[in-house]
């Protein structure tokens, strides 16, 4: 399939095993084009600063572990929300071992569309991940 027809995706995940699992899922998918993978929001931010204009570098979808910062006092949701507040437009799929429905409700107050979330559990399937990614992207695209 022509990559120009696929949704571009980047991953920010500090757990190497889970990051590799996500990379495999998005590489195998006919719907997505994996264009980057990072082990922390700091690594993502550093790479982003090297790639101006940001709007042409950003993917259409970011898959982000909520706690993927190297600083335990930080979390990635604030970083992602700040990027959106600057007018950057991309869908976001949050993944975490925590249940964070309340966090999504807060994020939706300032940026209502393009969010999805998944809780990391032993029952999480490849289909669950792809469906949540598609849902986040379609929600943002529909506005």
PLM segments and residue spans:
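Two-component/phosphorelay signaling modules centered on CheY-like receiver
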Residues: 7, 16-42
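Conserved acidic carboxylate
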Residues: 13
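Short, aromatic/basic amphipathic alpha-helical patches
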Residues: 22-26, 79, 104-110
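Conserved phosphotransfer microenvironments
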Residues: 41, 57-86, 99
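Short alpha-helical segment
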Residues: 41-50
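A short, hydrophobic beta-strand element within the central beta-sheet of small alpha/beta folds
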Residues: 62, 81, 88-107, 118-119
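Short, glycine/charged-rich "phosphate-handling" switch motifs in NTP-dependent
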Residues: 115
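The C-terminal output helix
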Residues: 127, 131-143
């Amino acid at each position: 399939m022509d990559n120009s027809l696929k949704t571009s995706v980047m991953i920010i995940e500090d757990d190497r095993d889970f990051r590799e699992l996500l990379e495999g899922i998005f590489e195998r998918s006919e719907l997505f084009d994996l264009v980057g993978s990072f082990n922390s929001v700091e690594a993502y931010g550093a790479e982003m600063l090297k790639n101006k204009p940001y709007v042409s570098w950003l993917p259409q979808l970011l898959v982000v572990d909520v706690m993927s910062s190297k600083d335990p006092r930080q979390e990635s949701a604030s970083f992602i929300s700040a990027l959106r507040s600057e007018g950057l437009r991309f869908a976001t799929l949050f993944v975490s071992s925590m249940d964070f429905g309340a966090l999504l409700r807060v994020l939706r107050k300032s940026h209502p569309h393009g969010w999805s979330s998944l809780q990391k559990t032993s029952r999480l399937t490849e289909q669950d991940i792809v469906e949540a990614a598609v849902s986040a992207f379609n929600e943002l695209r529909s506005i």
